[in-house]
């Protein structure tokens, strides 16, 4: 059974502000003593974005898929219901209680909602050939034709996956073993992206196999995924790529092996992620926008994103990341009200010197954290550096109201001499125990306001240079 978080969402949300205020009552360093690097964020912007996200419009008609014999492939019946309803103008495809086996992907169409009722489990099988023919996808930031995601929609509008049921990818047994042979294939795809090989010629199947995504919406508008439990992903779990108006609400992601990111908005606009629980072996939410030259070629940022009221219940991953595939840019992001029992990191801005691109106007507040390797990290030296000369630009970031019990690193910032991390405000942060409170190399206009670690006020005078070693 997955580990349950002992503290309720209501208790955490109610207690965070009070405890932080009490601790900071004796901390006297304020912005009267040091000017903010830029204006304070207007958090009403987050609500404006959330309200601007357009929900899908699904017609009222529905099709209840008839039960199939135990152990039989239900995919033909499910896909037939999708196609029939789509031809009629759209509607809801309903899976009732029981186990529904799918020997291959379900492809959604415009106007379709796949609804899993209480007690329904949609379980995907591991026959790789059934996830062919190849579809257009984006794999770790590079466009490619490869194995279909298990649930996939391409150039669809008004599309949804909803309900209290479960979707089981059986990824650890069937697809994670592909990872051991992945290195050369992964590098080849990155070479194709760097060298500008036409996307139509990037076909990665057979011996060039890449693990499929779990649920991917590709070039879609007005998308909703709500209420479902996603379990045991083959790769990234929910991956909106080149999408607009995406709502992810009240889902639970359970997948404790590597690369099982929960939700990865990728070159997408107007995205709302709220009230979700992540019990994953990687990032709960990772905001992305393409890798290196291929990301520059496309040039679509991720922007106007709100992530709020979520719980991270993994132990070996992290709660929220920006990057590392962020070459198209990430901007106008608002993150608030996270509760984290244990993690490698709470908030991670990551890229390397190949990426280029920029991260701008990202604001995070109200994090309650138990134990973490690093509370907040900025680095442009993330692994897989390929020798380029395109340092990313990180700037205009605020971090406020962070309450941490224990951290190996409190705040760690690694910029580059030609591209320092700049214009960062950290205020009202309390860490009870921090082995290394602050590391800082190549940062400008970094401001700390009411930051306490190890029971005392901390300023930039306490910072030590970034040292080699793992922080996440």
Question: Model segments located where?
Answer:
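Alpha-helix capping and helix-loop boundary segments enriched in small/acidic/polar residues
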Residues: 69-72, 260, 264, 268, ...
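Short, T/G/N/S-enriched strand-turn elements that build extracellular solenoid repeat scaffolds
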Residues: 82-84, 101-109, 236-242, 275, ...
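Right-handed parallel beta-helix
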Residues: 118-119, 157-165, 221-231, 244-255, ...
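Extracellular beta-rich repeat passengers
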Residues: 326, 337, 343-472
């Amino acid at each position: 059974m997955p580990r349950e978080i002992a503290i309720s969402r209501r208790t955490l949300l109610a207690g965070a502000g009070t405890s932080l205020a009490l601790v900071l009552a004796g901390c006297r360093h304020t912005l009267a003593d040091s000017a903010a690097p830029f204006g304070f964020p207007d958090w009403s912007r987050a609500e404006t974005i959330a309200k601007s996200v357009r929900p899908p419009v699904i017609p009222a008609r529905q099709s209840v898929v008839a039960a199939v014999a135990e152990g039989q492939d239900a995919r033909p019946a499910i896909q037939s219901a999708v196609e029939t309803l789509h031809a009629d103008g759209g509607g809801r495809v309903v899976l009732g209680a029981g186990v529904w086996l799918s020997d291959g992907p379900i492809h959604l169409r415009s106007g379709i909602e796949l609804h899993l009722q209480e007690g329904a489990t949609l379980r995907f099988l591991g026959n790789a050939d059934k996830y062919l023919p190849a579809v257009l996808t984006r794999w770790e930031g590079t466009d490619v034709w490869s194995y279909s995601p298990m649930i996939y929609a391409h150039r669809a509008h008004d599309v949804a996956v909803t309900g209290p049921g479960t979707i089981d990818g059986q990824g650890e047994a069937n697809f994670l073993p592909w990872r051991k042979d992945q290195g050369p294939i992964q590098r080849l795809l990155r070479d194709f992206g760097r060298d500008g090989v036409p996307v139509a010629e990037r076909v990665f199947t057979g011996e060039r196999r890449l693990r499929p995504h779990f649920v991917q919406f590709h070039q879609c508008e007005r998308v909703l995924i709500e209420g479902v439990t996603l379990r045991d992903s083959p790769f990234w779990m929910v991956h909106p790529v080149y999408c607009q108006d995406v709502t992810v609400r009240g889902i639970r992601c359970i997948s404790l092996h590597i690369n099982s990111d929960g939700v990865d908005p990728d070159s997408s606009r107007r995205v709302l992620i709220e009230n979700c629980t992540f019990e994953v072996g990687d990032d709960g939410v990772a905001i992305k926008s393409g890798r290196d030259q291929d990301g520059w070629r496309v040039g679509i940022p991720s922007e106007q994103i709100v992530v709020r009221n979520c719980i991270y219940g993994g132990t070996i991953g992290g709660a929220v990341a920006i990057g590392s595939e962020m070459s198209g840019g990430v901007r106008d992001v608002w993150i608030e009200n996270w509760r984290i029992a244990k993690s490698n990191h709470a908030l991670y801005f990551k890229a390397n010197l190949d990426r280029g691109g920029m991260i701008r106007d990202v604001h995070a507040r109200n994090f309650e954290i138990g134990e973490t390797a690093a509370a907040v990290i900025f680095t442009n030296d993330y692994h897989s550096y390929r020798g380029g000369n395109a340092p990313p630009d990180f700037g205009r970031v605020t971090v406020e109201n962070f309450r941490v019990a224990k951290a190996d690193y409190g705040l760690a910032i690694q910029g580059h001499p030609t591209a320092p991390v700049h214009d960062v405000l950290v205020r009202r942060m309390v860490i009870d125990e921090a082995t290394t409170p602050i590391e800082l190399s190549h940062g400008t206009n970094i401001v700390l306001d009411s930051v306490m670690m190890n029971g005392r006020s901390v300023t930039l005078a306490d910072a030590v240079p970034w040292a080699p070693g793992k922080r996440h």
